[in-house]
A protein has these predicted regions:
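Core catalytic alpha/beta fold that binds nucleotide/phospho-ligands
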Residues: 1-124
Length: 124
């Protein structure tokens, strides 16, 4: 049973501009240590960061909090299973909010095209 949904879309060029201006300050705020390692080794790092940013924003919307209201970017890790399907691991404030809302799992879908990255999150 679905409890809530969230979606987000981001212009990849906007993420590129932020990375140009802020560099590691931005990636340190958005990415977990494991995600940062993947980013550093990824062939398209800008799209990688854009998808993680969109995913975490979508998750925060599904939680009903947004970022900064007891939920931070660091409370969420986006990974891929052995077949490449994305998954989300929630901890700290994000996990607490999920449990308080009666959720057991956060399902996500990610997509990117030349100019945009988008994410869809479903709290179940």
């Amino acid at each position: 049973m679905s409890i809530a949904i969230g979606t987000d879309i981001v212009e990849i060029a906007r993420i590129a501009e932020v990375l140009e201006r802020q560099g590691e300050r931005f990636t340190d705020r958005i990415l977990s240590p494991s995600e940062k390692l993947q980013y550093q080794n990824h062939s398209d790092g800008i799209a990688f960061v854009a998808k993680r940013f969109a995913a975490k924003e979508a998750i925060a919307k599904a939680l009903g909090t947004g970022i900064g209201h007891g939920v931070s970017f660091q409370d969420m890790v986006i990974g891929n299973d052995e077949k490449g399907a994305p998954f989300a691991e929630l901890s700290n404030g994000a996990a607490e909010v999920m449990q308080a809302r009666g959720g057991k799992k956060m399902l996500i879908s990610l997509a990117d095209e030349r100019h945009y990255a988008m994410a869809y999150a479903v709290l179940t």
